[in-house]
Amino acid sequence: MKPIKDLVEVALGKKPADLVLKNAQVFNSFTGEFVTGDVAVVAGYIAGTGEYEGKTTYDLQGAYVTPGFIDGHVHIESSMVAPAEFARALVPAGTLTAVVDPHEIANVSGTAGIRYMLEASSNLPINIYLMLPSCVPATSLETAGAVLTARELSEFINHPRVLGLGELMDYPGVLNTHEEMLKKLAVTEGKLIDGHAPGISGKELTAYIAAGVNSEHECTTAEEARERLSRGMYLMLREGSATKNLLDLLPAVDRYTASRCFFVTDDRHPEDLIKLGSINHMVKLAVSAGADLPTVLQMATINAANYFRLYDLGAIAPGYRADILVFEDLQEFKPKYVFKDGKLVAENGKPLFTGYPVDDRAVRNTMRLKEINPEKLKIPAKSNRARVIGLIPHQIVTKKLELEVPVEGGYFKTSTEKDIAKLAVFERHNYTGNVGVGLIHGLGLKKGAIASTVAHDSHNLVVAGMSDEDIIAAVEELKRIGGGLTVVADGQVLGSLPLPIAGLMSDRTLYEVQEELEKLHRIVRNLGVSENYDPFMTLAFLSLPVIPELKLTDLGLVDVSTFSVVPVSL
């Protein structure tokens, strides 16, 4: 309960505050002004701004004070670390509230994954709220580890940290009023529904919004953003590791629309979290691009709080939670002090807290693969022409190529000369024995194999290799370590990064994970993989059958334009 008696008495100056930040330039989220004065805090809440005395004081000597930043949509799993370690990265960067979608771990572990995320993200000096995964499995052309219907989601919808339904990717299900989709919308009625519908417009967009969808984070152009804003949606401006849209969308933010715009990172990988930070990086980018500073700060704070109905967050004002950032300048946006509920939790970029033990047994031991049958790795050739997945530098979309490929004994074979490697996806959740096999062009791999259990959206095991023997060796290594990333050559494991939590997250620190990632990248480069590709990010999206043009799942080669499985051989 809010300590009303204490708040009133401190606000009136009848008793000292627990904490006073003196001589600050305080950002007012409502007027966009910086006002010189003190900030008084009692029992984790702001009692007032002005002139106050307290038991503990910090003389800020004119430093700038803002509310804690809010990330409106992020997948913790993309950081490859557990929630507590994720918090240790976000909090020093100034993000004190994150709205997460546990879509990735739910695809592996179902309701156990959601329960783990709720438990592992509690009792941390950061507000972590959940949006329930709306599309598990994401498509019918892959095998996920779980199926989440409206019935499963109803178990969580009234949890105090569950705010609604996560990104509604299945917009055809909405537009065609599929029965199960209508049930999910009914279960979450009265809660928020986040959108995910790039490219649709006109009456289809209108119908999608009419179903109850409130926001969109997939816009890539200002025109697309304006159409959504004009129809009442909130706009999430995204700057992730894989997809960066902030600068393209800023022109859609003006004095009429700004209050319905806020920032999200969606996916931030370890290197970016360490080097760039979180929402503070987006604030810096936007201001550097010429955006109005007060508007940008509102987008990082009060706008997101209002959208998510978190009415005690996003402002330095009486009765609000004392989630406070202190900056020495407004160029770099690196907080000197970070206060959560009035307690100092980070200083000069360093967290002042650790995690706590969490029972994660329900999301470990997720490598449920049948014994590998080498025959399943053979690709029959009716001719010497094949459908080949063509990689595009710095893109997650691929090209649908038709190439001449070497054939031996009636089967397609890899070719270093033609830069053609074999790609395989092994189902790893249900012991089905499913293996999808195809060919890719452009990776540059000369020998060996690289493999990962981070493979959107179902997170099966994906491996690219030049020989079946190394592909099998890579699979066996990932089984041994409980999931993760590995590189193999000549039957020898050259390096691995264990991700034992659902095959998606490490139980080690962010810095340790990044160090191992860098080692793996160096090894992969030595095997010939081009600098144009982040090898494991590339692998992670090669099995996502909703991103054009050709993808591979455990069920086979998918032509995204027809949403069907097609043979490799032409």
UniProtKB/Swiss-Prot annotation:
InterPro entries reported in the protein's UniProt record: Adenine_deam, Adenine_deam_C, Amidohydro-rel, Metal-dep_hydrolase_composite, Metal_Hydrolase
Keywords associated with the record: Hydrolase, Manganese
One Pfam family from the record: Amidohydro_1
Domain of life: Bacteria
Cofactor(s) in the UniProt record: Mn(2+)
Gene3D superfamilies membership: Metal-dependent hydrolases (3.20.20.140), Urease, subunit C, domain 1 (2.30.40.10)
Reactions catalysed: adenine + H2O + H(+) = hypoxanthine + NH4(+)
SUPFAM superfamilies found in the cross-reference section: Composite domain of metallo-dependent hydrolases (SSF51338), Metallo-dependent hydrolases (SSF51556)
Similarity field: Belongs to the metallo-dependent hydrolases superfamily. Adenine deaminase family.
PANTHER family found in the cross-reference section: ADENINE DEAMINASE (PTHR11113:SF2), N-ACETYLGLUCOSAMINE-6-PHOSPHATE DEACETYLASE (PTHR11113)
Official protein name in the record: Adenine deaminase 2
Protein species of origin: Carboxydothermus hydrogenoformans (strain ATCC BAA-161 / DSM 6008 / Z-2901)
Gene name in the database record: ade2
